[in-house]
């Protein structure tokens, strides 16, 4: 169980749903261990948040457990989408814990937001990668099949074709050096927030599948999550693997908790 997630399903305002998919990782595998590692390393955190004057155990968080992958990624994503959509229909905010970034496709389809906001080192705008259209490098492309707009925060690498796609009017890219000064302005739009832990510099979170230097510090990511959370109707944190001493999992778990605190306070 995610520490502090003591609510039962009927009373839950938030639901942690593990999604340990590790099917299309192209460099360092291990994202299947992400949900387990977040639950483990979150044991070290205090219950109380001084930013919002709230305790995590008072915020009606439920842990659904893990939705285990099948051999068919498309089938798995549809089942995961249904699981997350059921929580939405119950008035519960889904908090997906990956697993590779491909699980975000299920989250976005379940929430059906106007705006997709993502902290990520990569553009993820491929239509297909390595012959696979359901790949961690295609997530923003699939998100834009649902959302009207994508805001990619901290993106610093991609193919020439991806950068061409990112130059179109429905995509906003905020470079790492500008993220701290970025201010969300969504109006009445619904929002989905995804956190790929590789948005962080590898010196901060080395335990991820495709690390990319010159990234964000943890404090900047924390501020983004807190700023976006009040407008968000769904959240995920993804791409944590088991190839470090817990740095990536600690950051990811802390950002999930920051989302809950800020959303409940908003």
Please tell me what each predicted stretch does.
Residues 2-266:
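Conserved alpha-helical scaffold segments that buttress catalytic/binding sites
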